[in-house]
Amino acid sequence: MSHHWGYGKHNGPEHWHKDFPIAKGERQSPVDIDTHTAKYDPSLKPLSVSYDQATSLRILNNGHAFNVEFDDSQDKAVLKGGPLDGTYRLIQFHFHWGSLDGQGSEHTVDKKKYAAELHLVHWNTKYGDFGKAVQQPDGLAVLGIFLKVGSAKPGLQKVVDVLDSIKTKGKSADFTNFDPRGLLPESLDYWTYPGSLTTPPLLECVTWIVLKEPISVSSEQVLKFRKLNFNGEGEPEELMVDNWRPAQPLKNRQIKASFK
């Protein structure tokens, strides 16, 4: 594999298994959500998203996407309920997006791709820290939210406006007082299944919770995502687009729905 993993022809998702053999594992993500096969599970609880005390710290271009990082030293922004046992603490969120509006999401719904997908990453507090949590089958809970292009999402604009300052790999900026509640849709109806990180090391530690209702963002907002760079400053420009892993085999897994 050339150099390091990425999304290009020579280091993209079809090559990842060479360095990360779990890429061909039994609970890989993302997957296609077949709405006709997903089974309504009346025992699933409503999701509890408590982000009112969230403390954002920083935004970082890591050369694969950009992460908005949170203070996870206390139970400030937590996810509970739904398919989860216990409390999961928000550590960061990031997006995956396309070069065109017709692709970009990682999960698909009846094979439909959205323009982008938001991942809010939480770790199970019973494991003490994120690094230990990723070693456990129930270590992480990732809330996945689809983005479609339409009217602007006001709650996203603060993110969009800072992207100029983190154009290239390794750049970061202070990013405080951001309220992630502004990125949620009205409905918290969801699908859930056991899966993995969608980027190397692809660890099989994630309870996925994918919301049925997409959020709407404007074409101008998503265009700003596409102006970011995979490369570092002073290197040849490679636009940060199509940073998504395609759907993986469902294998022996059942996707459950919280709604009829």
UniProtKB/Swiss-Prot annotation:
Record-annotated residues binding substrate? 198-199
Tell me which CDD domains the record gives.
alpha_CA_I_II_III_XIII
Instruction: Return the GO cellular component terms, semicolon-separated.
Output: apical part of cell; cytoplasm; cytosol; extracellular exosome; myelin sheath; plasma membrane
Q: Among the record's GO biological process terms, what is one?
A: positive regulation of dipeptide transmembrane transport
Originating species: Homo sapiens (Human)
What mutagenesis or variant effect is reported for residue 65 to S? 2-fold decrease in enzyme efficiency, as determined by kcat/KM ratio, and efficiently inhibited by chlorzolamide
Protein's name according to its UniProt entry: Carbonic anhydrase 2
Please tell me, according to the UniProt entry, what happens when changing residue 64 to G.
Impaired activity, not rescued by 4-methylimidazole (4-MI)
Q: What is its EC number?
A: 4.2.1.1, 4.2.1.69
Task: Spell out the family assignment given in the record's similarity comment.
Answer: Belongs to the alpha-carbonic anhydrase family.
Name the residues annotated as site: Fine-tunes the proton-transfer properties of H-64.
Answer: 7, 62, 67
Q: Where in the cell is it found?
A: Cytoplasm; Cell membrane
> Which gene is this protein's source?
CA2
Q: What does this protein do?
A: Catalyzes the reversible hydration of carbon dioxide. Can also hydrate cyanamide to urea. Stimulates the chloride-bicarbonate exchange activity of SLC26A6. Essential for bone resorption and osteoclast differentiation. Involved in the regulation of fluid secretion into the anterior chamber of the eye. Contributes to intracellular pH regulation in the duodenal upper villous epithelium during proton-coupled peptide absorption.
* Residues the entry annotates as binding Zn(2+): 94, 96, 119
Q: Report the residues modified as Phosphoserine.
A: 2, 165, 172
The consequence of residue 67 to L is:
Reduced activity
Subunit description: Interacts with SLC4A4. Interaction with SLC4A7 regulates SLC4A7 transporter activity. Interacts with SLC26A6 isoform 4 (via C-terminus cytoplasmic domain).
Q: Does the keyword Zinc apply?
A: yes
What changing residue 119 to E does, per the record, is: Strongly reduced activity
Q: How is its activity regulated?
A: Activated by X-ray, histamine, L-adrenaline, L- and D-phenylalanine, L- and D-histidine, L-His-OMe and beta-Ala-His (carnosine).
The positions flagged as active site in the entry are: 64
- Chief subcellular location equals cytoplasm
